[in-house]
Amino acid sequence: MSLRTPPLFDAHTDAGAKLTEFGGWEMPVEFDSIRTEHDAVRESAGKFDISHMGEIEVSGPDAAALTNRLTTNDVASLAPGEATYAGITDDDGVLLDDTVVYRLPDGATYLFVPNAGNDELMAERWRSFADRWDLAATVDNATDDYAMVALQGPDALELLSSLDVDVFDLSRFEAAERTVAGVDCLVSRTGYTGEDGVELLFETAAAETVWSALDCQPCGLGARDTLRLEAGFLLGGNEFDPETNPRTPYEANIGFAVDLGTEFVGSDALAAQREAGPDERLVGLRLQDRGIARHGHDIVAAGDVVGEVTSGTMSPTLGAAIALGYVPVEYTEPGTELAVVVRGDEKDAVVEALPFYE
């Protein structure tokens, strides 16, 4: 099966980007170096092609009701131009995906952004439940119709201002229609880096126009991963996977994205888990010894395996090896001393409150 390519693929290859497969897409992993790109976002601004993320539009009289019953947060309460972070769970409360849901400025359409490679799966899920519940909603997988670019960093909003695009009035998780380099865009004050910034959604044909107008460091998936890990953000396929690592929002530390005042697929199971408390939870780990924890490495306490690393890296900002992983709740208190097995050797590690960087 051939890989999907983003609208900016030619621009990336012309720039000499190193490419990698991710979620069925061929995407840039780095342009210059992960460290250069990471530091640009922490210190000034960087731009990311995130067109591999899905865009699913839901419209019709029951669009809000359908989306509210399939996501863990209170989507029905969104005002036009507002967005929220939510999980998508099965009957057991297990995360199938995490997403940002927008109520578009027109007030009539909802847009949600599933992770790379999940767009058609999630579109079909919405259609199936609309039929099952006899809800009047139209579900359109618009992933191939749009390009999506993230502009992140402390100077991101000033950079847009230099293009006569003012978004300082937008609060976090607010979106508005703006014109960038002559292109109509949906601009939201959201991101996946732990920095301020925006994400821009616009028609595919205008991708190179918008990309070239944003005069800052291009960044690939490598820096996107180190940045999100420092911020303690989840990565689907690592921190949760319904097949290989089934986790609930409470286990994955995104209970803030669950509103049990709404009724959704999995809400009964999650209400029960919140009452009882999860047996395991995601924690941050900072290694004390030389070595880098990686996905799949064992976490040990007093020589016994108690958990597994889901993501790990050498943090460019902190100058330390950091990781995320699941352990029983008795080991989740910050300051708890554990170890990670790296190449057969136990490396001392300490549980650290998330995020690592804020």
From Swiss-Prot:
Q: What EC identifiers does the entry list?
A: 2.1.2.10
Q: Which InterPro entries match?
A: GCS_T, GCS_T_bac, GCST_C, GCV_T_N, GcvT/YgfZ/DmdA, GcvT/YgfZ_C, TrmE/GcvT_dom1
One Pfam family this chain carries? GCV_T
Its recorded reaction(s) are: N(6)-[(R)-S(8)-aminomethyldihydrolipoyl]-L-lysyl-[protein] + (6S)-5,6,7,8-tetrahydrofolate = N(6)-[(R)-dihydrolipoyl]-L-lysyl-[protein] + (6R)-5,10-methylene-5,6,7,8-tetrahydrofolate + NH4(+)
Q: Where is the signal peptide?
A: none
- What GO molecular functions are on record for this protein? aminomethyltransferase activity; transaminase activity
- Uppermost EC category: transferase
Gene Ontology CC annotations of this record: glycine cleavage complex
Task: Please give the biological process terms from Gene Ontology that the record holds.
Answer: glycine decarboxylation via glycine cleavage system
UniProt keyword annotations, A-Z = Aminotransferase, Transferase
Q: Which ranges of the sequence are coiled-coil?
A: none
Q: Which family does it belong to?
A: Belongs to the GcvT family.
Q: Which HAMAP family match?
A: GcvT
Function summary? The glycine cleavage system catalyzes the degradation of glycine.
PANTHER family the UniProt entry points to: AMINOMETHYLTRANSFERASE, AMINOMETHYLTRANSFERASE, MITOCHONDRIAL
SUBUNIT field: The glycine cleavage system is composed of four proteins: P, T, L and H.
Q: Supply the name of the protein.
A: Probable aminomethyltransferase
